[in-house]
């Protein structure tokens, strides 16, 4: 039980990709990983079960003691019991495309109906992976879709597209965006929620080191009011290297490293910082992603970015067609730094 509790702490702090589980299911999934019984997890998991199991584990942030007791009492038996669903596909004992699969190295993945592959990593692998290794997913093609400045009136459209393709994304939140009530939907559907800025006023945010941290904490507190915790993943407004933060950047990053925050820039931009058509945004994305075996894609979620939403299905399809897996950013993800 202590190991399960530790893993629950990891998942609840970081979140993860995929479709949510119930609290009971999430605890059972974590119990399976903690006890090493990943094979039992496969029995009775059809496409829907696989998609749910793939990443809803971050919902254990709200797990109750009774849920933990369920894991303790049921052990692997509950996770391996046949599904009670009337869908015959859930009775398969051998996983097919669309069901949860656990490779030998400890990664679990599912392939959605659209052909997108989403990843859930075991807690052991998370602990074995660190930004300090400076290794960028050898042998794998990984795509991290990220949205700055949201949520907005476009958020539900974005979520609908992500769900259609069976992929998840990371939101870097603008605290005064006016649509923070969308955050629970983002979080509960298995996406990552992170800090961007509260005001996005560059001169104010970067006036001093203290001013930056005041803005960050104000944003984190606003997020916590919606989803119950303040994230530790961050994206600098304007990126970590910009025209406004040269005097304070070094001290801010040093303090982040000391206090457990992790910042992310990007290596692919869809170009929606300017006014472009959806086709142009797709073209910019493909041009920047060409030759990259892992991509952290910068996009924006705001009321004015309708063309970004229009371009999103084609952008996702490009990465699917080129063999990319999709994941959300975590504290141990390779650091995309300028």
Where are these regions (language model features)?
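Short, low-complexity, disordered segments immediately C-terminal to signal peptides
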Residues: 46-74
């Amino acid at each position: 039980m202590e190991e399960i509790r530790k893993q629950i702490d990891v998942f609840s702090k970081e979140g993860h990709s995929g479709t949510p589980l119930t609290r009971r299911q999430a605890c059972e999934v974590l119990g399976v990983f903690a006890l090493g019984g990943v094979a039992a997890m496969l029995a009775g998991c059809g496409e829907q079960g696989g998609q749910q199991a793939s990443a809803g584990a971050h919902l254990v942030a709200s797990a109750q003691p009774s849920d933990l007791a369920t894991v303790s009492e049921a052990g692997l038996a509950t996770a391996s019991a046949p599904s009670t669903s009337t869908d015959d596909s859930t009775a398969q004992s051998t996983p097919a495309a669309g069901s949860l699969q656990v490779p030998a190295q400890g990664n679990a993945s599912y392939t959605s109906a659209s052909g997108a592959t989403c990843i859930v990593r075991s807690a052991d692998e998370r602990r074995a992976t660190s930004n300090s290794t400076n290794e960028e997913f050898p042998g794998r093609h990984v795509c991290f879709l990220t949205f700055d400045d949201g949520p907005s009136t476009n958020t539900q459209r974005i979520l609908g597209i992500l769900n259609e393709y069976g992929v998840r994304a990371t939101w870097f939140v603008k605290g005064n965006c006016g649509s923070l009530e969308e955050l629970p939907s983002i979080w509960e559907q298995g996406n990552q929620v992170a800090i961007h800025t509260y005001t996005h006023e560059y001169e104010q945010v970067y006036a001093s080191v203290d001013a930056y941290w005041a803005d960050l904490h104000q944003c984190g507190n606003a997020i916590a009011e919606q989803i119950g915790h303040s994230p530790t993943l961050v994206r600098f407004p304007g990126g970590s290297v910009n025209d406004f933060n040269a005097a304070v950047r070094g001290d801010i990053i040093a303090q982040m490293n000391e206090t457990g925050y992790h910042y992310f820039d990007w290596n692919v931009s869809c170009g929606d910082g300017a006014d472009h058509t959806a086709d142009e945004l797709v073209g910019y994305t493909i041009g920047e992603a060409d030759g990259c075996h892992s991509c952290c894609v910068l996009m924006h979620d705001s009321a004015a970015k309708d063309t970004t939403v229009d371009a999103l299905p084609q952008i996702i399809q490009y990465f699917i067609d080129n063999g990319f897996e999709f994941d959300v950013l975590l504290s141990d993800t390779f650091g995309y730094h300028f």
